[in-house]
Amino acid sequence: MPIGYLCTVAFVSWGVACALTRWRWPGPFSAIPALLVNELPFIVGYLLIASTVLTLVDGDLSSPAGAGVALPALGGLAVVVYRAMLAHTALHNTGKPRRPWGRILRAPFLPGRRDVVRVRSRAYGDGPSRTLDVYHHRDKPTGVPILLHVHGGSFRSGDKAREARPLIRHLTSRRGFVCVSTNYRLQPYVTLADQVADVREAITWVRAHAAAYGGDPGSLFVAGSSAGAYLAIRAVCEGEIAVNGLICRYGYYGNLAPRDDMPPMLVIHGEKDIVAPAPDASAFVERVRTVSSRPVIYTELPGAHHNFDMFESVRSAAVNAAVEAFIARID
């Protein structure tokens, strides 16, 4: 049996194993394969099937039965897809799931849509890191809700163009929202307090300028992913900035102390997150619920790991629908 084929099977099998478990000890050697397999199971399946067919056609397998080494990995991919399908129910989404199958099956990496205009790198402060991108529908409807997204990256890395792209495409293209994705200065060159101040300034900029793109400053929601969730919460609470709601996905919450005047929250976390474990998110939600009378919706996505919003996937489509429903409910 060819070494190249065995390596492909081994690579896919390792990714499937990481996706189906919570192995923390290999660090990025488990987190990255888990992300790729969990959110791109069809692409990974294409790779495995194509490799198997080519090996058979080239006559490098003694019999078709030799391709059986790929069956456990294919079975694991089927389980991954099944668990992703459960997100729609877990999030209490109503109606028939709307999944962009064309993108999910063929082009989960494509960055944009033709009906969405991206205004790049608007400055909200001094320096190259204090910039944001504004997304609005080509027809520029007026009086629409605004979503500001704060990226993650352990406070030391990340970029405004990396995360939440499926959500931004969905809200802007299908619902006409104005969406904004912001950068902020990164550690170790600044302090955590500086980063919180950056996010606060970004919120202020959005409130002042979003109307030029059709947004309603009175309908502003702030979303954060991973470390971005932490920064978003602190920026809103410590700055006493009024927003309509907070949306946190696979967030890191550390020792955040909730306040009784926190806005309504939607918290979505991966059941198998090895970067920011789900029990930490659940504990934070309980702390919020003890002091706040505002709605706090919490969902753990079956089988989900960290960074489940980077590609067009079955799971990200369900998350998009849940965010849209939350905004409609609160707005």
Predicted regions and their residues:
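Primarily recognizes the serine-hydrolase "nucleophile elbow" in alpha/beta-hydrolase
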Residues: 201-261
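Serine-hydrolase catalytic-loop signature spanning alpha/beta hydrolases and amidase-signature enzymes
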Residues: 154-157, 162, 179, 205
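Conserved alpha/beta-hydrolase "acid-adjacent" motif
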Residues: 274-283
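Short amphipathic alpha-helix adjacent to the substrate-entry channel of hydrolases
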Residues: 161-180
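Short beta-strand/loop motif that positions the catalytic acidic residue
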Residues: 261, 267-269, 273
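N-terminal cap/lid segment of alpha/beta-hydrolase-fold proteins
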Residues: 29-48, 93-142
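C-terminal catalytic histidine-bearing segment of alpha/beta-hydrolase fold enzymes
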Residues: 2-20, 24, 29, 38-48, ...
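Short beta-strand element of the alpha/beta-hydrolase
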Residues: 143-153
